[in-house]
A protein has these predicted regions:
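Catalytic core of DAGKc-family lipid kinases
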Residues: 78-206
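ATP/nucleoside-binding phosphotransfer catalytic cores, i.e., glycine-rich phosphate-binding loops
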Residues: 195-197, 202, 221-222, 227-228, ...
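Glycine-rich phosphate/pyrophosphate-binding beta-alpha loops
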Residues: 149, 153, 209-223, 288
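ATP/NTP phosphate-donor binding region
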Residues: 1-63, 70, 74, 111
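A residue-level signal for conserved active-site and pocket-lining positions in enzyme catalytic cores
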Residues: 8, 66, 128, 156, ...
């Protein structure tokens, strides 16, 4: 088995690069020999993954955060199928949020991610697909393993991206601080949406999300009923809600007990389309590539994931 490890040294505000020698040694002990490739800029992981698979690599391990894993995933998938049907994808989480692995009951440190690879089995999981409006106003496609969302979460991404505190706060505290800061300035927004092949409906919402995994935003248990291989996305729409009431309910989102809140609309779906006359920001696996209009779909069991 030919293995390539693709590392984002900038993940976790540069922490991954600093501890890479330790991760490298641990990987050698657990998975044997491998070739290492390091990214230098955004988008590199997509291209490196695609080139590796086209060259016959059968196992790729992503080392970095949720955004890096998403890039590797987007190198894995082409035209809604795996580029190489036999290849497997593993991961070592060492970024800011590290949310995806929580859905697989792997705790937050990189050592547990590495240890999990030693005796990992291949599990076929679903992959989400978003056809969205990019920042240059063109239509683009992006796949996601965890959660795609819009509204407040996208604004939180922007807040974190431009804050110096990202160099000092840990993942969970950073996302919590950014959420509280952003909710005071980010309004409820009007969207028009369609679930599966149902009728067009209107709603004012502060946050909408389509979940394959269960956690996002640095350990928020946003979609407690989501399953990675059920062929469905968990749709949550946070209806029009005041800032005070949102902050009152925020602890419930971390606990996963928020589905009972009257302002939360929940349904399992296969497809969801949303548009707005306002600028509604997207968040896809922790990155913000564009805006609504967007269509979210599920691709059942197309990814060979090592878990």
């Amino acid at each position: 088995m030919k293995t390539i490890v693709i590392v984002n040294p900038q993940a976790g505000n540069g922490r991954t690069g600093k501890i890479w020698p330790d991760i490298e040694n641990a990987l050698k002990q657990n998975i044997g020999s491998f070739q290492t490739l390091q990214t230098k800029s955004q988008g590199d992981a997509v291209l490196l993954t695609r080139k590796a698979l086209e060259g016959g690599t059968t196992r790729i391990v992503a080392v970095g955060g949720d955004g890096h894993l998403n890039e590797v995933l987007n190198g894995f998938i082409e035209n809604d199928v795996q580029l190489s049907p036999q290849a497997t994808l593993g991961f070592v989480m060492s970024g800011t949020g590290c949310d995806f692995q929580r859905s697989l009951n792997i705790s937050g440190n990189w050592q547990n991610s590495v240890a999990n690879l030693k005796d990992a089995k291949v599990r076929k999981i679903d992959v989400g697909k978003v056809t969205y409006t990019a920042r240059d106003n063109t239509q683009k496609i992006r796949y996601f393993d965890n959660i795609a969302s819009f509204g407040l979460s996208g604004a939180v991404d922007h807040c974190i991206e431009h804050s110096r505190l990202r160099n000092y706060l840990g993942g969970s505290f950073l996302f919590l601080w950014a959420t509280i800061k952003t909710v005071f300035t980010h309004p409820n927004q009007g969207i028009s949406y369609r679930i599966d092949d149902g009728p067009q409906e209107e709603i004012r919402t502060r946050l909408g999300l389509l979940a394959n995994g269960r956690y996002f935003g640095g350990a928020m248990h946003a979609a407690p009923q989501a399953e990675l291989d059920d062929g469905l996305l968990d749709l949550l729409l946070l209806k029009e809600i005041s800032v005070a009431k949102f902050l009152w309910h925020l602890p419930k989102i971390y606990k996963g007990t928020h589905l009972k809140i009257p302002e939360v609309y929940f349904q399992k779906v296969r497809k969801f389309t949303a548009l707005s006359s306002e600028q509604v920001i997207l968040d896809i696996d922790g990155e913000s590539p564009g805006y609504l209009e967007a269509t979210f779909e599920i691709l059942p069991r197309i990814l060979n994931l090592e878990v």
